[in-house]
Regions:
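Conserved beta-strand segments of alpha/beta enzyme cores
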Residues: 41, 157-158, 203
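Oxyanion/phosphate-interacting regions
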Residues: 148-153, 168-232
Length: 232
C-alpha cells in the first residue's frame, strides 16, 4: 500500500494535509461512480476548487480519505467516504475504515448496515445502549462550555475523543449515543455518515434543531448534533 511505500504529502491552501494516497483513492472512487451514475456530478474534497454547485441538487460527495493525518502517520481512524445527495438530502452512504477493518453503508430508511465477517448486519442504534450512561464521542478531550451545555441537557455521562467520519458510524450502531460539533466540517466530511446515521433511525441537525441540507455555498456545515435512534 502507499502507506508503506511511496507516500508523499503536501499542505493545501486551507492548511490541511493531502497525500498522494488521497488523490489515488479519489481517482478510483470517481472512476467507479462515473461508471455507475454517469449523469450525476461528483464533488470531492480534493477537486472542490474546480466545482460549481450553484443550483445543484443531485450529486455525489466524496472524501477519499477523511483523517489524512492518521493515514499519513500510520494511525487507524481514517475513513473512505462517498455519499449520494438527491434533492439536497443524503439518500445513500458508504464509509470504510480500512485500518480498523470496518465498513458501513446505507441506502434508504431502515437499510443501514455494517459488514461483519462477510455478513450484512443491520444497525439501529441499539448495540450498546444504556439509558443510565449516555456516551458521546467528541472532537477533543477538552469540552468547550457551549458544548458542555448541550451535554448537560442530554445528560451525557461519558465522552471519548474520536476522529473522522467514524463518529457517525459508532453513533449509528449504538456504540455511542451521539456527537456534538461546532461549525467545522465540510459537506463531504459528513454526507456518507449522515446517510448511514439517518437510515439507522438516528438524527443529524444543527444546534437549533434544523435539518442539514447539502449544496450550500463553500460546502460549509453549521453546528451539528448527532443522536442515535435510541435518543431520538
Amino acid at each position: 500500500s502507499l502507506r508503506n511505500k511511496g507516500l508523499t504529502k503536501k499542505i493545501k491552501s486551507d492548511n490541511t494535509p493531502v497525500s498522494n494516497g488521497d488523490l489515488e483513492v479519489d481517482k478510483i472512487i470517481s472512476t467507479k461512480l462515473k461508471e455507475l451514475t454517469p449523469s450525476i456530478p461528483i464533488i470531492s474534497e480534493e477537486t472542490s476548487d474546480n466545482k460549481s454547485i450553484e443550483d445543484l441538487k443531485d450529486f455525489w460527495l466524496v472524501d477519499p480519505i477523511d483523517g489524512t493525518y492518521d493515514y499519513i502517520n500510520n494511525l487507524e481512524e481514517f475513513t473512505i467516504n462517498a455519499g449520494l445527495i438527491l434533492d439536497r438530502k443524503p439518500v445513500a452512504g458508504l464509509i470504510c475504515a480500512p485500518a480498523k477493518k470496518r465498513m458501513f453503508y446505507s441506502y434508504g430508511e431502515g437499510n443501514a448496515y455494517e459488514f461483519i465477517n462477510g455478513n450484512e448486519v443491520k444497525i439501529d442504534g441499539s448495540r450498546n445502549f444504556n439509558k443510565d450512561i449516555i456516551k458521546f464521542v467528541s472532537y477533543s478531550n477538552k469540552i468547550k462550555p457551549e458544548i458542555q451545555i448541550i451535554f448537560d441537557k442530554l445528560n451525557v455521562k461519558e465522552h471519548t475523543k474520536m476522529k473522522s467520519s467514524l463518529k457517525f458510524c459508532v453513533v449509528a450502531t449504538g456504540e455511542f449515543d451521539g456527537y456534538v460539533a461546532e461549525p467545522r466540517a465540510c459537506e463531504w466530511d459528513i454526507a456518507a455518515g449522515h446517510a448511514i446515521l439517518k437510515h439507522s433511525g438516528g438524527l443529524v441537525t444543527d444546534f437549533d434543531n434544523n435539518e442539514i441540507l447539502y449544496g450550500k455555498k463553500d460546502f460549509k456545515n453549521p453546528s451539528l448534533i448527532l443522536k442515535s435512534k435510541m435518543l431520538v
